[in-house]
């Protein structure tokens, strides 16, 4: 069995990766356009752009599979540009493959450059020249999370496909299908928790599903155990102790327990707080949500710049205690009787 075959047996993300364009989830318009290339046996250079886990690399492999069949890897050079990002790789590996002779009955070869937005500027300039020189025998597929990092001369030579975030119902439907195939017990809340923590990244969602399934059942508790995050209920308790109870010391103790128990960084806490302030479980005026969101952004910036986690998060809790004062006063106010 090949290394990829062994990997597919171990990792569900590989085992259930779509092999053909018709199996790809959600990206209907993109799939239709790519299927035209398959039908015509011709295509331009391509740039696949979009967030992680939306099917960019899968679509590239599926396109090659539908063009060449099961042995498509014989006619494709795949490189991860984040590891092999320098000009030397472009001048050696890529150039040698691009100019090599075409096999019989193959219209063109494919060079797949994953994470192409991590290539150096010099490497991109060299790549641009290769794309011009060998267009008769080789097509390039570039994959990027941040297409703005790809130089304009390359972008102008490519047909750009923008992959969108996967819909919640599509991700959950796929996870349910995998659970059914693997005879895994799951509940809807557990699958929704996977979607939330994976942020629409299908590959990440499937990996979390497999890890949670190893604990026996895919439920909310097991999902948060395997990802090493606090549960939404714990984050809401932290918010309530500061906002609605005004108890700074209790909130700080809760914060420390979460950071120790789960090994959370300050940025992890900020991200979870940001998600929960917009939860329907937290009842507060819209203006207050906006003000808290703005302050969370400021605290995150400080943390990324190297500020101390505990000091910044303590400052955040103090801010929440102050912001929550009108809510506490309103809750304590007794209605006056009308005579």
Can you name each region flagged by the protein language model?
Residues 27, 200-201:
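Short loop-to-helix capping motifs
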Residues 234:
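Conserved ATP-binding/catalytic motifs of P-loop helicase motor domains
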Residues 111, 191-197, 203-217, 224-225, ...:
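C-terminal helical "lid" of AAA+/P-loop NTPase domains
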Residues 1-160, 170, 296, 300, ...:
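P-loop/Walker A NTP-binding region and its immediately flanking N-terminal helices
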Residues 238-339:
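Helix-rich C-terminal "collar"/helical-bundle subdomain used as an assembly and partner-interaction module
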């Amino acid at each position: 069995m090949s290394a990829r075959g062994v990997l597919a047996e171990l990792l569900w993300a590989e085992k259930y990766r779509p092999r053909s364009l018709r199996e790809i989830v959600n990206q209907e318009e993109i799939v239709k356009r790519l299927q035209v290339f398959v039908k015509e046996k011709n295509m331009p250079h391509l740039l696949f752009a979009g967030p992680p886990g939306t099917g960019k690399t899968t679509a590239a492999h599926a396109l090659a599979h539908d063009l060449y069949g099961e042995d498509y890897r014989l006619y494709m050079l795949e490189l991860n540009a984040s590891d092999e990002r320098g000009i030397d790789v472009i001048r050696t590996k890529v150039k040698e493959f691009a100019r090599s002779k075409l096999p019989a009955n193959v219209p063109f070869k494919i060079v797949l450059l994953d994470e192409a937005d991590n290539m150096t500027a010099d490497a991109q300039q060299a790549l641009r020249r290769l794309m011009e020189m060998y267009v008769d025998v080789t097509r390039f597929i570039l994959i990027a999370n941040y297409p703005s990092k790809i130089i304009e001369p390359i972008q102008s030579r490519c047909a750009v496909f923008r992959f969108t975030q996967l819909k919640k119902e599509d991700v959950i439907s796929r996870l349910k299908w995998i659970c059914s195939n693997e005879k895994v017990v799951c509940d809807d809340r557990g699958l929704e928790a996977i979607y939330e923590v994976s942020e629409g990244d299908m590959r990440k969602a499937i990996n979390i599903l497999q890890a949670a399934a190893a604990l026996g059942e895919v439920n909310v508790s097991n999902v948060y155990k395997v990802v090493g995050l606090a549960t939404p209920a714990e984050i809401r308790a932290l918010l309530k102790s500061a906002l609605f109870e005004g108890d700074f010391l209790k909130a700080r103790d809760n914060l420390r327990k979460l950071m120790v128990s789960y090994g959370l960084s300050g940025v992890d806490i900020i991200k979870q707080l940001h998600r929960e302030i917009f939860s329907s479980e937290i009842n507060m005026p819209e203006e207050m949500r906006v003000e808290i969101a703005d302050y969370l952004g400021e605290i995150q910036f400080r943390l990324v710049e190297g500020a101390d986690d505990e000091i910044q998060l303590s400052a955040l809790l103090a801010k929440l205690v102050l912001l929550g004062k009108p809510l506490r006063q309103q809750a304590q106010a007794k209605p006056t009787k009308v005579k």
